[in-house]
């Protein structure tokens, strides 16, 4: 049922998010040039890797991330518009609207058995950890929220 609701929500709201995505892509292209997208291997359900696509927010290069992040990129991240391409992953069945955020596959060996439970569900565009503190949380707190979500997942929790 969750999958059906995810797809329905993405399709029904496409009239809003597709034009926003096209506009954001044009802004990235004007500010940073090509490539427009940032692609990275992330761990999905059951730890299966998939290629996550986001709008690029940084200049390319070897400098630290803080130095490569542009003003446009900072704005895209603050508004979460950089994550609009992830709606495509929801349509493909690689992600859900709500679930633990997908992390790079290189972290898989570092999870404790309890933390690895976050992969029992599809990763989400937003998650319980993001709703309850986002970047102000420690990694331990984020993983605890992720596992709590896995244990308590419901339509009403997603709507909340």
Identify the function of each model-found stretch:
Residues 60, 100, 152:
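Short, conserved catalytic or interaction motifs in soluble domains
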Residues 24, 73, 88, 129, ...:
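A cross-family signal for key residues in well-ordered alpha-helices
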């Amino acid at each position: 049922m969750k999958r059906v609701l995810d797809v329905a929500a993405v399709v029904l709201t496409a009239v809003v998010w597709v034009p926003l995505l096209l506009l954001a892509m044009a802004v990235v292209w004007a500010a940073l040039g090509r490539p427009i997208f940032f692609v990275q291997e992330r761990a999905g359900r059951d730890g299966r890797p998939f290629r996550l696509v986001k709008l690029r927010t940084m200049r390319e290069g070897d400098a630290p991330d803080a130095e490569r992040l542009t003003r446009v990129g900072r704005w895209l991240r603050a508004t979460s518009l950089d994550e609009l391409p992830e709606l495509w992953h929801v349509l493909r069945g690689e992600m859900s609207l709500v679930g633990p955020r997908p992390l790079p596959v290189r972290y898989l060996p570092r999870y404790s058995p309890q933390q690895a439970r976050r992969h029992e569900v599809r990763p989400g565009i937003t998650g319980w950890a993001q709703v309850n503190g986002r970047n102000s949380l420690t990694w331990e707190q984020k993983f605890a929220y992720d596992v709590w979500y896995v244990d308590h997942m419901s339509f009403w929790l997603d709507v909340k």
